[in-house]
Regions:
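Short loop/turn motifs at secondary-structure junctions and domain boundaries
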Residues: 27-31
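Short, aliphatic-rich beta-strand segments
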Residues: 15-20
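A short acidic/small-residue loop/turn micro-motif
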Residues: 24, 53-56
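Short, acidic, Ser/Thr-enriched surface-loop or helix-capping motifs
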Residues: 10-11, 40-41
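A short, polar/charged loop-to-alpha-helix boundary motif
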Residues: 56-68
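Cysteine/selenocysteine-centered motifs that mediate thiol-based redox chemistry or coordinate metal-sulfur cofactors
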Residues: 70-91
């Protein structure tokens, strides 16, 4: 699910963003106050994540990289898919 993961950390707003592949139309699913998963409208799979307050999730900010995004995408991806699928049923 996370092969080819690219990431960027914006320290001025403390947001770690990660994505797979090229940008495409997505639906965003907030799984908690600081994590948003992006679901592809084409493949119906998680293709990105935004992590607000990313530095709070790790002790050393030098470790804010793709491994944190990859771990959180694996952790929250299934819940995001459930939320997304439920929301599509009610449209």
């Amino acid at each position: 699910m996370t092969d080819g993961l690219q990431w960027d950390y914006n320290c001025s707003v403390d947001v770690l963003s990660a994505w797979i592949g090229t940008p495409e139309p997505c639906d965003e699913v907030a799984v908690d106050d600081s994590v948003v998963i992006r679901i592809s409208r084409k493949t119906y799979q998680p293709v990105g994540i935004d992590i607000r307050f990313a530095s709070r999730r790790i002790r050393w900010t030098g470790a804010l990289d793709g491994s944190l995004a990859r771990a959180l995408l694996h952790q929250h991806g299934p819940a995001a898919m459930n939320i997304w699928q439920t929301s599509r049923l009610h449209r």
